Amino acid sequence: MSEGLQRCFVLHRRPYSESSLILDVFSEEYGRVTLMSKGARSKRSNLKGALQPFTPLLLKWSGNGSMKTLRQAEPISLGLPLAGINLYSAMYVNELVGRVLMAEVAMPAFFHDYLHALTELAHNENPEPALRRFELALLSAMGYGVDFLHCAGTGEAIDPSMTYRYREQKGFIASVRRDNLTFMGDELIAISERRFITKEQLKAAKRFTRIALKPYLGGKPLKSRELFMPTIALSRARSIGK
């Protein structure tokens, strides 16, 4: 049972029976929680339009099992203004949280990282930097500790002009080979600072987070990624045509 109203976001919702909803929510104080909202789909329900992803909510629930019962819900504000590729990117963020985080593990600091990511997506045209910062915050919240600033082999500071190869659970070692697991030193420094100045640094961050998140996602593809691939292709086609 929650102690009072809790700040939450709906990650995913699905219909249940004729008039109810099952909600997967991410809360500030309780982490990821599954809720049953009885009667939320009925015509008389005042919650019908409120229990949506990307709308800041105050929720209260009861119950001790894996599925709680929603008792009270209040929208804090209107939903975040997300559209196009940024909407699909926010759906990707929600799917990652739902897939990777364990249920009912409090992560108040990461909740703020999540909120910051959605806010960035709502107010910036290019979603890529926000997505990379969010993925890195997620890895950090799960205890995925990687030192981007020191060579794992020697302990020396990363040289921006050198090439380093990533070794899972160990870090980065100097390398003369170039493949999917190697990164330039300046790219590693940019990832550590979560500040991406060049396209190459942003691409390197994406490549690293894909490698690091793969064990947590298993072989099951992300649905949100499949949804926004046609949108990305269309956007690229329009850019070429200009």
Swiss-Prot record:
Keywords: DNA damage, DNA recombination, DNA repair. Involved in DNA repair and RecF pathway recombination. Coiled coil: none annotated. The keyword Disulfide bond does not apply. GO terms for biological process: DNA recombination; double-strand break repair. PANTHER family: DNA REPAIR PROTEIN RECO (PTHR33991:SF1). Signal peptide: none annotated. The lineage of its organism: Bacteria, Pseudomonadati, Pseudomonadota, Gammaproteobacteria, Vibrionales. InterPro entries: ARFGAP/RecO (IPR037278), DNA_rep/recomb_RecO_N (IPR022572), NA-bd_OB-fold (IPR012340), RecO (IPR003717), RecO_C (IPR042242). GO terms for cellular component: bacterial nucleoid. Gene3D superfamilies: Nucleic acid-binding proteins (2.40.50.140), Recombination protein O, C-terminal domain (1.20.1440.120). Belongs to the RecO family. The gene is recO. It comes from Vibrio atlanticus (strain LGP32) (Vibrio splendidus (strain Mel32)). This is DNA repair protein RecO. It holds the Pfam family RecO_C. It comes from the Bacteria.
